[in-house]
Amino acid sequence: MSAGPLQAAPKKNYGALIGAGPAVGGAAFNRTLSEVASYERSRRDHATPDYRIKIVVVGDGATGKTSLLMSYTQGQFPEDYVPTIFENYVTNIEGPRGKVIELALWDTAGQEEYSRLRPLSYGDVDIVMVCYAADNRTSLTNAEELWFPEVRHFCPHAPMMLVGLKSDLYSLDALDRLVDPTDAELVARKMGAFVHLQCSAKTRQCLEDVFNTAIHTALYDELRAPPQRGVKGMFKKKQQRDPQAQSYKRVRKHRCVVL
């Protein structure tokens, strides 16, 4: 696989990978917390990583998307809400077999007035996180009725996950006003999301699981067990000598549409 951004592969059985157990929050990746940096600046100033993964985070405004990314990349939870237009966060990860992964996280604006600018974020995306807030049932409805159609329009083949934010609120008593996780699971199935996870940026509960799952999915082929020796292994090696067999690794196929 080349050092370029990974291609979304819709035909892979992501469900099998996630359902196997270790993938969801599976083998943790060693991260280097970085300062906020633009994706392009990171590519220019730092040594070329072995892999680049781009994750775009979408959802209603004030659901906690920015807090999610800041908590993961910087270990900080912002106390004050500041509406986001566009922000990029970059963190380096030690991936499988000691490979270095550059994880580019794109934060988008959920407000309607930015709907014409938001599609610019979808280019070359590897994973899309559609987010809702545990204390906002409307945000879950919009995940299915607003964000899912938008993502599928601009990125018809990008793997998509449904992520519930502010999960720490479930520890309080006012459960009647929170999103029922069963309803969220149903929405995830309707959307065709490969997984539904909940996390808290404030307490960091399951935060690493969310991103580890996204990374495992983007690196699906790399994380699969190597072929066994024997006839099957010899056939596999023969396939790898064929340039066409390595088109996934060498050629960047742009599958997202930006109008």
Swiss-Prot record:
<keyword id="KW-1003">Cell membrane</keyword>
<feature type="propeptide" description="Removed in mature form">
    <location>
        <begin position="257"/>
        <end position="259"/>
    </location>
</feature>
<dbReference type="GO" id="GO:0005886">
    <property type="term" value="C:plasma membrane"/>
</dbReference>
<dbReference type="GO" id="GO:0000131">
    <property type="term" value="C:incipient cellular bud site"/>
</dbReference>
<feature type="lipid moiety-binding region" description="S-geranylgeranyl cysteine">
    <location>
        <position position="256"/>
    </location>
</feature>
<keyword id="KW-0488">Methylation</keyword>
<keyword id="KW-0547">Nucleotide-binding</keyword>
<dbReference type="Pfam" id="PF00071">
    <property type="entry name" value="Ras"/>
</dbReference>
<keyword id="KW-0342">GTP-binding</keyword>
<keyword id="KW-0472">Membrane</keyword>
<protein>
    <recommendedName>
        <fullName>GTP-binding protein RHO4</fullName>
    </recommendedName>
</protein>
<dbReference type="GO" id="GO:0019901">
    <property type="term" value="F:protein kinase binding"/>
</dbReference>
<dbReference type="GO" id="GO:0007165">
    <property type="term" value="P:signal transduction"/>
</dbReference>
<feature type="modified residue" description="Cysteine methyl ester">
    <location>
        <position position="256"/>
    </location>
</feature>
<keyword id="KW-0449">Lipoprotein</keyword>
<dbReference type="GO" id="GO:0005935">
    <property type="term" value="C:cellular bud neck"/>
</dbReference>
<dbReference type="GO" id="GO:0007264">
    <property type="term" value="P:small GTPase-mediated signal transduction"/>
</dbReference>
<dbReference type="GO" id="GO:0003924">
    <property type="term" value="F:GTPase activity"/>
</dbReference>
<dbReference type="InterPro" id="IPR027417">
    <property type="entry name" value="P-loop_NTPase"/>
</dbReference>
<dbReference type="GO" id="GO:0007015">
    <property type="term" value="P:actin filament organization"/>
</dbReference>
<feature type="binding site">
    <location>
        <begin position="107"/>
        <end position="111"/>
    </location>
    <ligand>
        <name>GTP</name>
    </ligand>
</feature>
<feature type="binding site">
    <location>
        <begin position="59"/>
        <end position="66"/>
    </location>
    <ligand>
        <name>GTP</name>
    </ligand>
</feature>
<keyword id="KW-0636">Prenylation</keyword>
<dbReference type="GO" id="GO:0032956">
    <property type="term" value="P:regulation of actin cytoskeleton organization"/>
</dbReference>
<dbReference type="GO" id="GO:0005525">
    <property type="term" value="F:GTP binding"/>
</dbReference>
<comment type="similarity">
    <text>Belongs to the small GTPase superfamily. Rho family.</text>
</comment>
<dbReference type="GO" id="GO:0090338">
    <property type="term" value="P:positive regulation of formin-nucleated actin cable assembly"/>
</dbReference>
<dbReference type="InterPro" id="IPR003578">
    <property type="entry name" value="Small_GTPase_Rho"/>
</dbReference>
<dbReference type="GO" id="GO:0030011">
    <property type="term" value="P:maintenance of cell polarity"/>
</dbReference>
<feature type="short sequence motif" description="Effector region">
    <location>
        <begin position="81"/>
        <end position="89"/>
    </location>
</feature>
<dbReference type="InterPro" id="IPR001806">
    <property type="entry name" value="Small_GTPase"/>
</dbReference>
<dbReference type="InterPro" id="IPR005225">
    <property type="entry name" value="Small_GTP-bd"/>
</dbReference>
<dbReference type="GO" id="GO:0005829">
    <property type="term" value="C:cytosol"/>
</dbReference>
<feature type="binding site">
    <location>
        <begin position="165"/>
        <end position="168"/>
    </location>
    <ligand>
        <name>GTP</name>
    </ligand>
</feature>
